[in-house]
Amino acid sequence: MAADQISVRPARAADRRSLAVLFAEVAQERDGIAAEPPIDVDGLAEHWRLDGTLVAVADGDLVGEIRVDPSWMGFGEIGMMVAASWRGRGVGSALVAAAIEWARGQGLHKLALQVFPHNKAAIALYRKFGFVEEGRLAAHVRRADGQLWDLIEMGLLL
């Protein structure tokens, strides 16, 4: 499926369960997001915040999500996840483009994010949209096995 067959729209209450399942699937990979299994899908679905959340839909399935958390300081912090089977197929690009448009519409002046240094595909995607590395948080995330992982901070002035 081409990127033009992927639709991005604001998340709805009916998406909460699919979002929680996607989150659990991405967490199971143990390398893209800080959360690790087990994930309480039912509890997560019940409390999933929809404000600023955009979802990517293909063939009627939710295949990705990006959320912009606006700060009182005028910037937005973003977090994104894409189903493994949909990576490299334009979902991430569609989500980032939509988030940038949404943030501009909200009057935000900047988007910021954190990404693991080993997540080269995500870093390349963000750079494609103009995000630049602004710093590194050393040993910032403690994994369940005791490993300490760095985070790269990236930002985009809108």
Give a label for each model feature.
Residues A2, W149-L158:
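Terminal substrate-recognition subdomain of acyl/acetyltransferases
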Residues S7-L19:
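A short beta-loop-alpha structural element at the N-terminal edge
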